């Protein structure tokens, strides 16, 4: 009986682990917004907001290194950047290192 219970628990763990390891696009974009908020506030004390338009995001699986940094996914699309005055529409690029690592680079370009 104990052996069956142990095998059942092991089988359940094997099935659940991949589901827990997966990270959604929304989670990745949240990581990008968090990194952007820190980075942009350091660069510009007047920074107020960076918000990604999740309806217009491209997600490219990369799984390679950029220099010495592993990057699993490249997100790019439209976002809103606000420092002083009204918000600006921008394009963004975010390099994400994967589960447990988070976003490692965020850059904006004017639209």
Name these PLM-found stretches.
Residues 1-7:
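Bacterial N-terminal signal peptides that target proteins for export
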Residues 16-18:
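N-terminal signal peptide c-region/cleavage motif recognized by signal peptidases
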Residues 20-111:
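Mitochondrial intermembrane space
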């Amino acid at each position: 009986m104990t052996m069956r219970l142990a095998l059942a628990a092991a089988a359940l763990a094997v099935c659940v682990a991949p589901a827990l390891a997966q990270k959604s696009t929304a989670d990745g974009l949240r990581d990008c917004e968090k990194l952007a908020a820190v980075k942009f506030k350091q660069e510009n004390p007047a920074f107020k907001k960076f918000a990604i338009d999740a309806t217009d995001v491209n997600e490219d699986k990369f799984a390679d290194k950029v220099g010495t940094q592993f990057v699993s996914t490249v997100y790019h699309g439209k976002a809103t950047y606000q420092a002083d005055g009204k918000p600006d529409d921008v394009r963004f690029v975010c390099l994400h290192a994967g589960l447990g690592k988070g976003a490692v680079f965020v850059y904006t370009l004017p639209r």
